[in-house]
Design a protein with these regions (language model features):
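Residues forming the flavin
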Residues: 3-53, 58-162, 166-532
């Protein structure tokens, strides 16, 4: 197979244009047939208003060695496609089926691999299945009535279900897990373009259907799900897991448990800490959701009027900066054509997130603009101090908005006065809102960094710091505030406990969490033989 890198064509090109470009690049005679697959497509807007798609293409043709040798071009090479493969099973026999705690991306993909390999896992999920969960979330947004275990953070699919649904990751992936996850999503209903888009996106509406289809398949092939089943305790003997205890005091004997908890399972973090599972505080970031008109972002990223003229998707952006005080300020979970959502999961605590549907057709762009937080900011004497710092910010936000999302125009934030109304555009939110003064939620040093960041980003995206940009508070759940320690085999200090995913501090989004779930399943398989 031949790999062509950096094959560039103008946006708006035809399929024939692409085929002709491949033929020209490889000097394939007009009568010679070939097959090709697009492996990656990215948008190059560095020379706007001229926009280009840049491709990575795999080509199958006769005499591949000869073609590559004659061309002698760095962008053309021979490759052997190798997909993700499960490890061979270990020799130790499991006396009981493995248990997975959490049905987010990490838990679902651990369940996927173990189910296909014949381990028939049991999946415990504190929230509801995605259909019922979606109804609870919509009800919360309309009424403010919160279900503590069925909300934007908890339930089948995990926190990423109500987000932008990004499927990109910076995790290095020589094993092929990345593409395997994408292929699995496509198998259960995701659009096939996620396989090659440089910034793949699935959207809340499609992701919910994919999750349901995946669950149905797993059940049909031997997995068991128990929803509304919260882990309350673990039983340990001689430093080995003996059983899991659920909220209703059901005892589930277990030799192996994959803990795919999610970044908001604070009660479970505390329970594990009481059992002295080694964990450490880690860096995270907090800030505000910031909304701009999507057209403003489109024009900045593509050139004036280019989005409609070339039928391009709503433009994303990514901005970052570092300042002399040691803090980083950057965008996080940017949602083109999206909504700001109330993402709370605890009583009297408010936090926000961003969410997009698959079409990204909303009028506003939003992103978290967040400020880095280190253990030095909250005097970490205990591994859970970062978690308590988050809770303090969320409680202050709840009090400020009386349970609603508190909002403020950036110009008013800069002047330290409460807003009275919107400017040239309105907010797009899921959840009740009110105007307030968001100053004082963060420390003065963090506020100063946030202001510097907004001003700096206006040098990259014109009018980014416009006075009527809408801030919503607070974004606190950017990542887990703790890391549950594990060894190179994925196991914690307690034999049989495998912590993973975003909650354990080993992932940062749908893809990396799913890949970590596969890795943990692989770790279990390499050691144990399934119960038959």
């Amino acid at each position: 197979m031949i790999k062509i890198n950096q094959l560039k064509l103008p946006v708006g090109h035809s399929q024939k244009d692409l085929e002709d470009k491949i033929r020209k690049t490889l000097r394939i005679p007009s009568k010679e047939t070939f097959h090709y697959e697009v492996m990656r497509r990215s948008l190059d807007a560095r020379k706007k208003p001229s926009l280009f798609y840049v491709y990575c293409i795999y080509v199958t043709i006769r005499q591949e060695n000869s073609i590559v040798k004659k061309l002698h071009q760095p962008s053309v090479s021979l490759v052997t496609e190798t997909g993700y493969r499960f490890s061979e099973m270990g020799q130790e026999r499991l006396n009981r089926r493995p248990v997975i705690v959490g049905a987010g991306p990490c838990g679902l993909f651990a369940a996927w691999q173990l189910t296909l390999a014949g381990y028939a896992p049991l999946i415990l999920e504190r929230g509801k299945q995605v259909e019922d969960r979606s109804a609870d979330v919509e009800r919360f947004w309309k009424t403010g009535i919160l279900q503590p275990d069925s909300n934007v953070q908890f339930g089948e699919g995990g926190a990423g279900t109500f987000s932008d649904g990004k499927l990109n990751t910076v995790v290095k992936d020589p094993s092929g897990r990345n593409r395997y996850v994408l292929e699995t999503f496509v198998k259960f209903g995701a659009p096939s373009d996620i396989l090659y888009d440089a910034k793949p996106h699935i959207g809340t509406d499609i992701l919910a259907k994919v999750i349901k289809n995946m669950r149905d398949y797993l059940i049909k092939h031997g997995a068991e799900f128990r929803f509304q089943t919260c882990l309350k305790d673990i039983q340990i003997k001689e430093n080995a897991l003996q059983a899991l205890v659920t909220e209703d005091d059901t005892v589930i004997p277990a030799d192996v448990a994959i803990l795919a908890l999610g970044h908001s399972a604070r009660d479970t973090f505390m329970m594990l800490h009481q059992h002295q599972l080694p964990m450490e505080a880690k860096n995270f970031a907090v800030g505000f959701r910031v909304e701009h008109p999507q057209q403003m972002i489109d024009d900045a990223m593509y050139g004036n009027g280019k989005r409609n003229a070339l039928r391009l998707p709503a433009a994303p952006y990514k901005v970052t900066s570092n300042f002399p005080n040691g803090r980083g300020v950057y965008s996080f979970c940017m949602c083109p054509g999206g909504y700001v959502v109330n993402a709370s999961s605890m009583k009297e605590k408010t936090c926000v997130n961003g969410m997009s549907y698959s079409g990204r057709s909303g009028k506003n762009a939003n992103s978290a603009i967040i400020v880095s937080v280190s253990p030095a900011d909250y005097g970490a004497q205990d591994p859970l101090d970062g978690m308590h710092f988050q809770e303090t910010l969320e409680h202050k936000t709840y009090q400020l908005g009386n349970g609603k999302i508190p909002q403020q125009l950036f110009g008013d934030y800069r002047q330290n006065i409460a807003s009275q109304g919107y400017g040239d555009f309105n907010s797009q939110t899921k959840g009740q809102t009110c105007f307030a003064n968001l100053r004082g939620l963060m420390t003065e040093d963090m506020e100063h960094s946030f202001l510097l960041g907004m001003e700096h980003f206006s040098n990259i995206i014109p009018q980014f710091d416009r006075s009527d940009a809408i801030l919503s508070g607070m974004e606190t759940r950017t990542s887990s505030p703790v890391r549950i320690m594990r060894d190179t085999n994925g196991e914690s200090r307690v034999h049989g406990i495998y912590p993973g995913g975003e909650g354990a501090g080993y992932a940062g989004g749908i893809m990396s969490a799913a890949m970590d779930g596969l890795r943990l399943a692989d770790d279990v398989m390499k050691r144990y033989h399934p119960v038959y």
